[in-house]
Amino acid sequence: MSHGTYYECEPRGGQQPLEFSGGRAGPGELGDMCEHEASIDLSAYIESGEEQLLSDLFAVKPAPEARGLKGPGTPAFPHYLPPDPRPFAYPPHTFGPDRKALGPGIYSSPGSYDPRAVAVKEEPRGPEGSRAASRGSYNPLQYQVAHCGQTAMHLPPTLAAPGQPLRVLKAPLATAAPPCSPLLKAPSPAGPLHKGKKAVNKDSLEYRLRRERNNIAVRKSRDKAKRRILETQQKVLEYMAENERLRSRVEQLTQELDTLRNLFRQIPEAANLIKGVGGCS
């Protein structure tokens, strides 16, 4: 993003243009090159929160020891924790409930963090054990942040104190929280019979009467279907007989028509014969 007040485009009066010579320029000439540049003010682009953050970051100045001016007994990096002179060794494994015997090592001190102290699953021994598990749940993140010297955070008071043992008791499944969404509700256990049907004893009189009525209805429907089939077959036979009669009638009428046509063809010849016989007489 460019601005007109950042740099001066026009040369000032009396300013000579830069000339590049073959030799190396001295320190005085290099210093004169940047005299006409203006500084940029970034205070308008920095918010109040960011300004406070920058002031906190740049307020710490390096000590003279950090620049190499340290004494014989002063550490090179004063902001870091001194190394532990004890040897780095893991303590022997202990499987007790309280993990009291950690053994000699770098993590055996009371104020140090043990990375091997993972959550130990213990089954509750009664209703009191499940309630103690909900009260004594421990967050390892709280323990790490509390022992970090370079981090400053405001932790909620609801978290457990770092002095509590690293144990997480698993609550029974019966005390699990219900699902939040109504669509994720657990299906209700299905009963032996669906809703709307009552249990009927097969040896009862009502069940026998119902089965008898169903059997009678099935037999009636089957008899009705058989009667319809027989009626259809009978109609088919009647139609076939009527078709045969009609065919015979058509053949008879065709023969009569042919006979009549032959008679009409012979009538003019007979008339001519009669006329010829009458003229001869």
From Swiss-Prot:
The keyword Chloroplast does not apply. One of its GO terms (molecular function) is sequence-specific double-stranded DNA binding. It comes from the Eukaryota. Belongs to the bZIP family. C/EBP subfamily. The keyword Ubl conjugation applies. This is CCAAT/enhancer-binding protein epsilon. Residues 204-267 form the bZIP domain. Strongest expression occurs in promyelocyte and late-myeloblast-like cell lines. Phosphorylated. Residues 1-30 are annotated as: Disordered. InterPro entries: bZIP (IPR004827), bZIP_sf (IPR046347), C/EBP (IPR031106), C/EBP_chordates (IPR016468). There is a cross-link at residue 121 (Glycyl lysine isopeptide (Lys-Gly) (interchain with G-Cter in SUMO2)). Binds DNA as a homodimer and as a heterodimer. Can form stable heterodimers with CEBPA, CEBPB and CEBPD. Interacts with GATA1 and SPI1. Interacts with SMARCD2. Residues 208-228 are annotated as: Basic motif. The modification Phosphoserine is found at residue 181. Transcriptional activator. C/EBP are DNA-binding proteins that recognize two different motifs: the CCAAT homology common to many promoters and the enhanced core homology common to many enhancers. Required for the promyelocyte-myelocyte transition in myeloid differentiation.
